């Protein structure tokens, strides 16, 4: 089992310069290999095998950076090709842009070249770097590699990859369960009738973003003022992303602590985000990220996440009598049934999702536990 820990690092001036060179060299090698592979395939119909070592003689400055970072660029390109041939919808490998505000490189731990001790991190070529280690790491874990990244706000982070023995999770009996229905206006509505008071981080910052975008439009493209303003906008987006991620981590932890079984719908978030009616809401809510957090947190706790088929008519089934309502428009926010049941559409769907999840597992519950 692999576990990743992400920490903030504080490189000095020379280390920042080294990171900048490494980011550039990794991008150069990746793009060079991709270009040669494409050209060779178009001419011969065969796949070209190429390694970063080929370029070091022609471009001696590649020797100034961590060689393992260049090797990982090759591996990342191979992965991109494999992903494309496995599922063409992911798209053909693309060239890496110099203008991307987020930059990174990956290196491997070989013969102790990466070390973490006394609030400092040792990296190949860079030496010792100050690190903000906000959580402890089990001594039994084995350090395998590190990914150094520079975010849009110019802050540096390191993601440390550790190998750990797969723990024997004690599978807990299902005593408490909950169903979650994705909501456009909120993050979700649960089967207990609770609505999340979701802080729409992106929408709250839209006015400020629009103001900064207008200022950018008045700058001459490519000028120092233009680049400075562009970086300011990127920093604002990075801040919004961190706010959203922090909230989703806390919300998924709360649910994991209270419930043994969580039932959700399998939604195609990519398709939903492309819909002009609610694309912004899908991106702002971060439902896909939220379910990913839920999945691994529940698994580590020995609990279960059940995904209901996206074609299951959770919104159209009456949670009281079980009757299927054939006509239900998206704008109908209240569910009304001939049996007399009248309730919020999303609450009704969440109850049905929970029941369907219990049915799939073959579990019956006497009572449900609410989040306090």
Where are these regions (language model features)?
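Nucleic-acid substrate recognition interfaces
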Residues: 1-372
């Amino acid at each position: 089992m692999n576990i990743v820990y992400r920490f903030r690092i504080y490189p000095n001036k020379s280390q920042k310069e080294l990171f900048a060179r490494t980011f550039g060299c990794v991008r150069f090698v990746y793009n060079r290999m991709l270009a040669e592979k494409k050209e060779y395939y178009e001419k011969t119909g065969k796949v070209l095998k190429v390694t970063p070592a080929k370029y070091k003689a022609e471009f001696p400055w590649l020797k100034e950076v961590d060689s393992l970072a260049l090797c990982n660029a090759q591996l990342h390109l191979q992965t991109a090709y494999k992903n494309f041939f496995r599922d063409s919808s992911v798209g053909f490998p693309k060239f890496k842009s110099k203008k991307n505000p987020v930059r990174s490189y990956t290196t491997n731990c070989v013969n102790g070249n990466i070390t973490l001790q006394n609030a400092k991190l040792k990296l190949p070529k860079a030496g010792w770097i100050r690190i903000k280690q906000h959580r402890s790491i089990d001594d039994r874990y084995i350090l395998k590699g590190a990914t150094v990244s520079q975010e849009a706000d110019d802050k540096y982070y390191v993601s440390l990859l550790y190998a750990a023995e797969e723990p024997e999770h004690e599978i807990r009996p299902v005593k408490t369960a909950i169903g979650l229905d994705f909501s456009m206006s909120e993050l979700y509505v649960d089967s207990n009738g609770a609505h999340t008071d979701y802080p729409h981080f992106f929408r709250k910052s839209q006015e400020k973003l629009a103001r900064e975008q207008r200022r950018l439009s008045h700058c001459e493209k490519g000028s120092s003022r233009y680049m400075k303003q562009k970086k300011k906008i990127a920093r604002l987006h990075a801040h919004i992303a961190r706010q959203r991620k922090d909230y989703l981590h806390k919300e998924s932890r709360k649910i994991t602590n209270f419930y043994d079984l969580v039932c959700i719908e399998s939604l195609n978030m990519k398709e939903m985000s492309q819909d002009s009616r609610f694309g912004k809401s899908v991106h702002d809510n971060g439902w896909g990220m939220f379910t990913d957090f839920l999945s691994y947190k529940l698994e580590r706790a020995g609990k279960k996440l059940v995904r209901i088929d996206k074609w299951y008519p959770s919104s159209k089934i009456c949670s009281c009598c079980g009757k299927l309502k054939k006509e239900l428009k998206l704008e109908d926010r209240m569910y009304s049934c001939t049996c007399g049941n009248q309730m919020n559409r999303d609450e009704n769907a969440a109850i049905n999702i929970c029941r369907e999840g219990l049915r799939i597992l073959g579990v019956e519950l006497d009572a449900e536990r609410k989040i306090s």
